[in-house]
């Protein structure tokens, strides 16, 4: 006769956390004793140190929740090795797939039991689930054994050792971020990546996590829609079972007064790379405050990133001599004269902009690089004094970057608006002679390239 298991009794020992010593280190995990057999026991949490109050403290997952899975491997003399996944339904563990069976007069063993949300069994091997990426969740191995009466399996994580660390990235709540890594070994993998790229979404507290090992001199760069929020280089290899916190938070400044205060503080702290999270509907009053706040700042010193706002209104950042570069990851519309006569500006990056009004980028003498989104509405005729750039005096020195799906733009005068308007034709721009010759919107550029 053979036994088939449909449930698991869980006995879990909480992993106790200690404080940290490294510059961004948060916690140290060691094992303790608190053994109680329960249908659901405590999850072996990382914890979060009170000594590193970066962002909103987050100890991570602390208990089993509905939908959690455990992956078990069982071996018996007669029936061999079996594999199964058990899923937690909120009150008990149920067999989700596979089978665990053995002859009643034998005592099976359990070579492996995993909590690894990104993985599943496939022909006896752990493989990534579709759409999952190693390093974006836990990979914990516990132990399991048959109970003396043969009625259940007891799974323990009391001796579980994480052979990886956690990097908690504190940033804006509920936002997609990308994380570029160097010399990183994801949890569950033995292959170190010289260069990696991860797409994460922060939770409502603004936290997103990577699980794995960073080598000495490993570098991490956190970006939001291409805008760099934080770059950090590790001064030593991360330690197993420790949690680290990386501060990629952004100053939230919704009102004019908050904007004024934030810029004043950043300038007082000698910051030159300034990132502000504005309201999506930030308008004339907020941008007037930005101009005034930078009025007495040294020319050509500020790399400004404005997150959240959807539009730069007419004259919004006009004649802002402090600007050296500007990044506008969420902006879809740039108004008339919005950035005109920012004479020391060297780079403009607006990868989601689709609408640009007359003379938005006029009056530049230092501009070298412009990155734009897929344009659908551009106002102003080139070389007429009313185009988005100055006449051909300066555009031949500019490298223009467009998305690969950009269409050819055709311009004509519109009597209703009394403006010259460029609209897409349906023809792919990067398959035309104008692309080869560096011509776009009637302007001659140093080069035109795809940024995708």
Enumerate the predicted regions with their spans.
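Sec-type signal peptide cleavage vicinity
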Residues: 2-10, 17-265, 365, 452
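Structural signature of tandem-repeat unit edges
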Residues: 275-280, 299-311, 321-333, 343-355, ...
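Surface-exposed substrate-engagement region within the catalytic domains
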Residues: 207-211, 219-226, 373, 390-407, ...
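Extracellular/surface-exposed low-complexity segments
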Residues: 246-251, 397-452
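Core hydrophobic positions of leucine-rich repeats
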Residues: 290-294, 312-323, 334-344, 356-367, ...
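N-terminal segments that cap or nucleate solenoid repeat domains
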Residues: 251-294, 451
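Assembly/interface hotspot detector across virion components, adhesins/toxins, and nucleic-acid enzymes
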Residues: 86-88, 119, 144-146, 198-202, ...
